[in-house]
């Protein structure tokens, strides 16, 4: 942690959250953000809290204490990482219908969800021949890294997951009553909500990785873990490697897809303008705009570097 000034905290909690308390908490957090170097994204809804924040340790401590107070000291499922640089541009606080959008209002993860499996017992569960493993993340996240032999629902967003369950899940089950269903995601929130959905639909033996991939990589040494590749994250780092350091991926600023070092060597790739994912998505006028934007970004970087040297 030496030399790393910014503390990054990912958190979530499902609990009944009253609207007046949400509005009050948002106001207090915006005030803290205005007075301090706090950045990140927080989402509040009647079902709880979700988000990732970045700041120096003393500011993070203030925010976490405040969130604990409003969550009535419920478990915030906190995961901590560190960085030399800010990983968000600014602080955003959003009030939504759901803290992670699935679009199934009749489920209640705070009252009914699957069984947590901690990192130490996850390998044993997913190696069991009577277990199927489901990655509940989006297809572009899965392409960056996932667990061995896991099922990819190939969803563009989490709200497509219920349809995949209805259309495809049973085809992967030898026995609906006895097969273990183990699910995982980045930090735990999506797979927890997914277990609530499956229990509502009558599935048995539902498990989810406590703390998600991030906690697993923090707990399990590289030589023993079964995660392959890097873990996509929704901030400037793009992806984290097995040591939870910034990985090798960048973002295509045209389409927002993660691109590897190998992807950047492909003939279709033009920094800030296009990649092989979006080669057919944009017009020539779009690419001209992207090219001009990239030139401005490059000029700004050169200018900042010159100021720093002077």
Curated annotation (Swiss-Prot):
Q: Has the keyword Nucleus been applied to this entry?
A: no
EC number annotated for this UniProt entry: 1.14.-.-
Q: Which UniProt keywords apply?
A: Oxidoreductase, tRNA processing
A single GO BP: tRNA modification
What does it catalyze? uridine(34) in tRNA + AH2 + O2 = 5-hydroxyuridine(34) in tRNA + A + H2O
Output the InterPro entries linked to this UniProt entry: Rhodanese-like_dom, Rhodanese-like_dom_sf, TrhO, TRHO_N
- Pfam families named among the record's database cross-references: Rhodanese, UPF0176_N
What are the residue boundaries of the Rhodanese domain, all occurrences included? 127-225
Q: What class of enzyme is it?
A: oxidoreductase
Active site: residue positions? 185 (cysteine persulfide intermediate)
Q: Name one GO molecular function term.
A: oxidoreductase activity, acting on paired donors, with incorporation or reduction of molecular oxygen
Entry keyword Oxidoreductase: yes
Q: What is the similarity comment for this entry? A: Belongs to the TrhO family.
Q: Which NCBIfam families match?
A: PRK00142.1-4 (NF001136)
Q: What is this protein called?
A: tRNA uridine(34) hydroxylase
Q: Which gene encodes it?
A: trhO
